[in-house]
């Protein structure tokens, strides 16, 4: 199992290209199952979750062609199976996203209940009740969601809670339903807008994506298309925090400041100078970060996927802060690991009080989920001495070549590969 070894060594400096968004690429890949022709996706990041999704699409029968560095063409015409098996689905939450497309396009689907980051119970009731409202018969048996419908029928659905992948699944399913579907209380994340753009390029008729009411006029079929996925706002935010924590000066390219306004506001509150261009963000930090309170909530509020990174920054900030996690009930697993590095954090329920310390000290720590892992990398960048992070397979789910990108900015970080599995 690979590990990361870091030594805190001062400010990050330089330029970096941001990858395409994992959480946009995954639904777009699932959406290819809806088409009658090949769909080409560009700006796809090299990540373990993407590889898993491509394996899943191949298992269903789709022909997957990886062209060049960042392009992937999926030909859904040879799809012959509607079963998404446990072995593939267990590692990745987003695999539930094939449910809506398979059902809408093939009339049935069997998808193992998904895994993913262990940050809470993460039910899929919003997905299932929405598909039922569209006319599907759904049962959950032997760990599989089994769904059937000759043709879905458009209807008005008020989602019981704001769910990102729930909105995406219903949006995809509704594109091929008969008549109009109105999704109310929809999630407004940029990745949903991106998915709607991809589906529209395939011939879907969608309005309102990015607002809480999305209208979809069902069509008989979707055709081939080409779509480039949005930049990864969470990767962007993670590198911005890295620069802020190390007192650095970096410029991120091929990103979009409009996707992470709440994060940029918090960085400015912490004392960073942030300058944005058409597809660039430059951050300069000339002081010790000021502690900032953070409260996670659905977009456009502060993202839960940036909570752990800001907690890491608050650990070395001037003053105290309160970090409140309102989305997931178990997303403070980084607290005990940050404490091993000398952080002063008191977590109780959904709130953590962080008192900034002058310095962290390196220690062996364990990654527990994707963004928790990122927070440990950030802490390792400023800790005195060596930080050794174990179980970084979580990190590989969501960050493309993180050690190469940070090294290019001057960080002392290297991957220690161990071919012997310690399971
Ligand atoms: C692949 C992907 O895009 N993952 C993102 C997506 O996850 P995901 O789509 O799984 O997250 P949701 O938006 O569905 O979850 C939000 C909250 O609603 C709850 N809930 C959700 C569905 C449901 O049927 N019942 C229910 O109770 C969840 O347990 C959670 O407490 O959005 C999260 C919230 O921004 C992000 O952290 C994840 O990175
Ligand atoms: C929680 C995340 O991923 P997933 O929903 O795929 O588990 C994430 O991207 O931070």
Curated annotation (Swiss-Prot):
GO terms for cellular component: cytoplasm. Its main location: cytoplasm. Keywords: Cell cycle, Cell division, Cell shape, Cell wall biogenesis/degradation, Cytoplasm, Peptidoglycan synthesis, Pyruvate, Transferase. The modification 2-(S-cysteinyl)pyruvic acid O-phosphothioketal is found at residue 117. UDP-N-acetyl-alpha-D-glucosamine binds at residues 93, 305, 327. Phosphoenolpyruvate binds at residues 22-23. It is found in: Cytoplasm. InterPro entries: Enolpyruvate_Tfrase_dom (IPR001986), Enolpyruvate_Tfrase_sf (IPR036968), MurA_subfamily (IPR050068), RNA3'P_cycl/enolpyr_Trfase_a/b (IPR013792), UDP_GlcNAc_COvinyl_MurA (IPR005750). Gene3D superfamilies: Enolpyruvate transferase domain. Pfam families: EPSP_synthase. GO terms for biological process: cell division; cell wall organization; peptidoglycan biosynthetic process; regulation of cell shape; UDP-N-acetylgalactosamine biosynthetic process. Pathway: Cell wall biogenesis; peptidoglycan biosynthesis. Its EC number is 2.5.1.7. It is an enzyme of class 2 (transferase). It comes from the Bacteria. The active site is at 117 (proton donor). It catalyses: phosphoenolpyruvate + UDP-N-acetyl-alpha-D-glucosamine = UDP-N-acetyl-3-O-(1-carboxyvinyl)-alpha-D-glucosamine + phosphate. GO terms for molecular function: UDP-N-acetylglucosamine 1-carboxyvinyltransferase activity. NCBIfam families: murA (TIGR01072), PRK09369.1 (NF006873). Belongs to the EPSP synthase family. MurA subfamily. Cell wall formation. Adds enolpyruvyl to UDP-N-acetylglucosamine. This is UDP-N-acetylglucosamine 1-carboxyvinyltransferase. It comes from Acidithiobacillus ferrooxidans (strain ATCC 23270 / DSM 14882 / CIP 104768 / NCIMB 8455). The gene is murA.
